[in-house]
C-alpha cells in the first residue's frame, strides 16, 4: 500500500462524525437505521460519511432490503494499525544496514 492509500485512511478519521460512527460500530454490525438514531444525524450525512469510511477500507457494508448494514473491517483496521506503527518506527528496527542513534533517544 502506498502513501496515497495511507493518506486516504488517515483523512477518513479526521471527522467527528466518522469517529462517532466507528465507535458505534466497535461492538458489532449495525443497520443504518440504528446509526441514524444513535448518532442523531440525517440519512444524507450518514451516507456521505459511510462512503468515505468504506472507500478507505475501514468499514464494510451490505444491503438487506432497503437498509444498509455496516461493520468495521477488522482486517483493514489491523492493516491501518500496522501502517501507523510503521511510521512510528525507525528504519533501523527493520533494516540492520541502517545505522542511527535512535536507541539512545527516548
Give names to the regions the model predicted.
Residues 18, 48-49:
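Histidine-centered divalent metal-coordination motifs
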Residues 4-42, 64, 68-77:
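N-terminal helix-turn-helix DNA-binding core of bacterial DNA-binding proteins
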Residues 23, 50-51:
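Core alpha-helical elements of the protein kinase catalytic domain
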Residues 45:
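Residues in the helix-turn-helix
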Residues 2-5, 74-106:
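Amphipathic alpha-helical dimerization/coiled-coil segments
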Residues 37, 48, 54-55:
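Alpha-helical residues within the helix-turn-helix
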Amino acid at each position: 500500500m502506498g502513501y496515497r492509500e495511507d493518506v486516504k485512511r488517515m483523512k477518513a478519521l479526521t471527522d467527528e462524525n466518522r469517529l462517532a460512527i466507528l465507535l458505534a460500530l466497535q461492538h458489532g454490525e449495525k443497520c443504518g437505521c440504528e446509526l441514524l438514531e444513535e448518532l442523531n444525524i440525517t440519512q444524507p450525512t450518514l451516507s456521505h460519511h459511510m462512503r468515505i469510511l468504506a472507500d478507505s477500507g475501514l468499514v464494510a457494508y451490505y444491503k438487506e432490503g432497503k437498509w444498509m448494514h455496516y461493520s468495521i473491517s477488522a482486517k483493514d483496521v489491523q492493516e491501518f494499525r500496522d501502517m501507523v506503527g510503521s511510521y512510528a518506527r525507525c528504519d533501523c528496527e527493520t533494516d540492520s544496514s541502517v545505522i542511527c542513534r535512535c536507541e539512545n533517544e527516548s
